[in-house]
Amino acid sequence: MNIVILAAGMGKRMQSALPKVLHPLAGKPLLSHVIDTARQLSPSTLCIIYGHGGEQVPQLLQSKDLSFAKQEPQLGTGHAVMQAVPQLNDDSPTLILYGDVPLTTAASLQRLLDIAGADKLGILTVDLDNPTGYGRIVRENGAITRIVEQKDANEQERSIREVNTGIIVAPTKQLKTWLANLSNKNAQGEYYLTDIVASAVADGVQVVSAQPDHVWETHGVNSKVQLAELERVHQNNIARALLEHGVTLADPARIDVRGTLTCGRDVSIDVGCIFEGDVTLADGVRIDAYCVLHNTTVGAQTHIRPYSHFEGATVGTACIIGPYARLRPGAVLGEDVHIGNFVEVKNSDIAAHSKANHLTYIGDSTIGSRVNIGAGTITCNYDGVNKSRTIIEDDVFVGSATQLIAPIRVGKGSTIGAGTTLTKDAPADKLTVSRSRQITVDGWQRPVKIKK
């Protein structure tokens, strides 16, 4: 099967220099949603028609299974499909999709393909209470005879509620002939793809139709308002699927999934959370309000407190994280690790039962089990040129306001006194401290402010 995706439109109402089909919905371009759906149908040819925005579309979406054809100037949908003709295989049908209609499901498209087979012209249609702006499906004795655009329709035709979604499948050899015979003698001066319906009828090719499971599958995006509306539709669909899977959502209207969210049993998600990329939450995970998780895996029974931000992290079981914690790429936490408020962890492994509860930076470090990191501790991993690692072995106690100048190793069971700046390895099972001796100055008085 051939699939052609029309993605050349300017999108003037978007009020943006970015091509319309590259605007994001749920974290990825509109066009990428359509491509992902098309791939589920296993096409032999997948051709993207681009135009507005120059080379941005092919540059962003390069892939071995995609081909591209440029439409310049843009003279209508029929003219757009003409640009793909050299790439279409005559021996299989051609399905035409739209880069700004992102939510059509593969199931609805497969239904259309099954009805059309290899020798019929198939049209995906919907019935609308208000069909204004859509091409009307004109039938005679139940059979589709043509599609008339809104601007070319008479009063009787405008009363028709069944409309064309634009999604069409056609036998390719005949499609090429019909495209070659298109005329632009209409109110828009464009070559309408819909005119092939009349050509098919004239050639004795049966025209059939199918309808999607949901009307929103055919909604397109022509403005930021429509984009926002479709974003809510999509997020509501995701929220419903999560609820049906057993996830507890404090408010289904206040969750955003911009990628893939996989949840185990008894997962609870509070309001305002955002999930980006691939996120996996194991059984019993609890996420409090306004957390952001990007490409992160969270182990069972872990509790993430409010306003925490994870990116590229792996969190073990029964951990307590936050509030206001930040896990950056390469953060790997073992079982029962506690990361508290205003603690940042980057490119570090922290083993089971260790804690850093307050105001700490842990970067490029390996931390053993049962380690306590005091408030205000900083691993000084960067010398202005190179980054070095800090190694803290099991059962270490690091006092508050400590700086560890990497590369450095803290031996097993050692204690680092509060306020220490550690520049050499600390031996195991001993107290290491480096700070000036405390003194008291008798008779000292504070300076007095000088009057000006």
Curated annotation (Swiss-Prot):
UniProt keyword Phosphoprotein present: no
Gene3D superfamilies xrefs: Hexapeptide repeat proteins (2.160.10.10), Spore Coat Polysaccharide Biosynthesis Protein SpsA, Chain A (3.90.550.10)
SUPFAM superfamilies tied to this protein: Nucleotide-diphospho-sugar transferases, Trimeric LpxA-like enzymes
Pathway(s) the chain acts in: Nucleotide-sugar biosynthesis; UDP-N-acetyl-alpha-D-glucosamine biosynthesis; N-acetyl-alpha-D-glucosamine 1-phosphate from alpha-D-glucosamine 6-phosphate (route II): step 2/2; Nucleotide-sugar biosynthesis; UDP-N-acetyl-alpha-D-glucosamine biosynthesis; UDP-N-acetyl-alpha-D-glucosamine from N-acetyl-alpha-D-glucosamine 1-phosphate: step 1/1; Bacterial outer membrane biogenesis; LPS lipid A biosynthesis
Region described as Pyrophosphorylase: 1-224
GO biological process, one term: lipid A biosynthetic process
Catalysed reaction, written as an equation: alpha-D-glucosamine 1-phosphate + acetyl-CoA = N-acetyl-alpha-D-glucosamine 1-phosphate + CoA + H(+); N-acetyl-alpha-D-glucosamine 1-phosphate + UTP + H(+) = UDP-N-acetyl-alpha-D-glucosamine + diphosphate
Cofactors named for this entry: Mg(2+)
EC identifiers of the protein: 2.7.7.23, 2.3.1.157
Key words of the record: Acyltransferase, Cell shape, Cell wall biogenesis/degradation, Cytoplasm, Magnesium, Metal-binding, Multifunctional enzyme, Nucleotidyltransferase, Peptidoglycan synthesis, Repeat, Transferase
Official protein name in the record: Bifunctional protein GlmU
Protein species of origin: Herminiimonas arsenicoxydans
